[in-house]
Amino acid sequence: MTKGILGRKIGMTQIFAENGDLIPVTVIHATPNVVLQKKTIENDGYEAIQLGFEDISEKRANKPQIGHAAKANTAPKRFIREIRGANINEYEVGQEVKVDIFSEGDIVDVTGISKGKGFQGAIKRHGQSRGPMAHGSRYHRRPGSMGAIAPNRVFKTKNLPGRMGGERVTIQNLKIVKVDPERNLLLIKGNVPGPRKGLVIVKSAVKAKAKAK
């Protein structure tokens, strides 16, 4: 069954394995989440648990938010997300979910909002090749052909310059190197989406058949 927790990306560092290998890791600070609601097939058409992360003052919350959190005997939350595929029988409303639901060696998927890059060209945004850099070249970094003459228009799928980043991105099959329940930290091998202090969702990997090497 799926396990999941909400946290914030602290940044990257490196640790040494027992055999001396240097491992680059991303540190995620996941303070205890609170189960705000259990979604059931009878009431909602699907099964999921709703987690809340980071308290906010009641002054900054509206009445529906305050009432929803009160059912779980907790304060209103800044971030609320659902974890589908979880065994809802293992959870109760108001229960805390901590980093110790994971263990070293677990394979997870991490979802976050990618860093915003602003307005970028087709080469940086889509990875296109540039044109010839010779003096007589007609273009260097332009998008290139807009398409054939016959349609008499540019198709929506044409890769063009525009805003880059700020999108929901999931990196799959990352390995948890270390779990620190005392400090509510997860150390995950490799990089995860988003800037420092960005919200991330750590869930059991969907496609992992075996533990990553």
UniProtKB/Swiss-Prot annotation:
The record's annotation in PANTHER family points to: 50S RIBOSOMAL PROTEIN L3, LARGE RIBOSOMAL SUBUNIT PROTEIN UL3C
Full protein name: Large ribosomal subunit protein uL3
GO: which molecular function terms? rRNA binding; structural constituent of ribosome
Q: What keywords sit in the KW lines?
A: Ribonucleoprotein, Ribosomal protein, RNA-binding, rRNA-binding
Task: Kindly give the PROSITE patterns that the UniProt entry links to this protein.
Answer: RIBOSOMAL_L3
> Which Gene3D superfamilies does this one have?
3.30.160.810, Translation factors
Subunit field text: Part of the 50S ribosomal subunit. Forms a cluster with proteins L14 and L19.
Show the InterPro entries listed in the entry.
Ribosomal_uL3, Ribosomal_uL3_bac/org-type, Ribosomal_uL3_CS, Transl_B-barrel_sf
Q: What does this protein do?
A: One of the primary rRNA binding proteins, it binds directly near the 3'-end of the 23S rRNA, where it nucleates assembly of the 50S subunit.
- What GO CC annotations are associated with the protein? cytosolic large ribosomal subunit
What domain of life is recorded for the organism? Bacteria
Q: Which SUPFAM superfamilies match?
A: Translation proteins (SSF50447)
Q: Which family does it belong to?
A: Belongs to the universal ribosomal protein uL3 family.
Query: For the region Disordered, what residue ranges are annotated?
Result: 122-147
Does the record carry Glycosyltransferase as a key word?
no
Provide one Gene Ontology biological process annotation: translation
